[in-house]
Amino acid sequence: AHLRYLNNFETLGEIPIMGFNPYKDTPMANHPPSPLEEQLKIMAVTRIMYPEIRITVPTPTIGPKNVEYSLNAGANNLATVIADNYPLEVKGVGSPVCGNYDDVVSVINKLGLTPQTI
């Protein structure tokens, strides 16, 4: 029902899909993270319902090792890909503690895809 609601927006260009990850020292610190399988189902259904839309998945949240599953499920935009030498005083999506660029690019290349560079 929530995905159908998005039909109300004529200029919708992107649907970000990000599962819940608990952060320590927050009210939901002990709540379990969103299961990967549920996130992948949402990506696949979103791709079927919106074949032309950009589906964005933040790599620190999904984890570099799960990028392949996300792309196969229908995601076509990977957000928050961080260079290995980036100064990691970063807070936010996934609160990464190390860069993930090489891991993410390796998965993209393994799938026979070419990463877009900025």
Q: Which stretches of residues belong to each language-model region?
A:
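Auxiliary Fe-S-binding modules of radical SAM enzymes
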Residues: 7-118
